[in-house]
């Protein structure tokens, strides 16, 4: 509801969107909160045109769902302590690490994964987010 119309939303205010979510939760209706409230707006703000064109229409239509890939066995949700690394290899990144307590993993299409991309800066910096298909080889 609160997404801009150009991205498939209704252009409603934040208050109207919160009321909608409150009512959705009150009646127990499923809603992809992470995808709608975190992933979509982040892509709107920071994504490339290609990412916007690929992800946002599918999210707005309720056809694409993300799980969250932040927590790690030795760090919990302390993102500054991330050990998972993403190293550029040509036009791609190779990601190595371990995630745990992956919220919303059942039935998701992508992992919204945080990984360290720059180990040479303070630990609360040098972290990037990746949209990784859940069926990527190596994900178990």
Kindly label every feature range from the protein language model.
Residues 28-29, 79, 139-140:
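Short, ligand-facing micro-motifs at secondary-structure edges
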Residues 92, 96-140:
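A short core secondary-structure module
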Residues 74-82:
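Active-site-adjacent elements of ketosynthase-type condensing enzymes
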Residues 6-8, 71-75, 100-101:
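Short, solvent-exposed loop/turn elements at beta->coil junctions and helix N-caps
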Residues 1-62, 104-110:
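Internal helix-loop-helix
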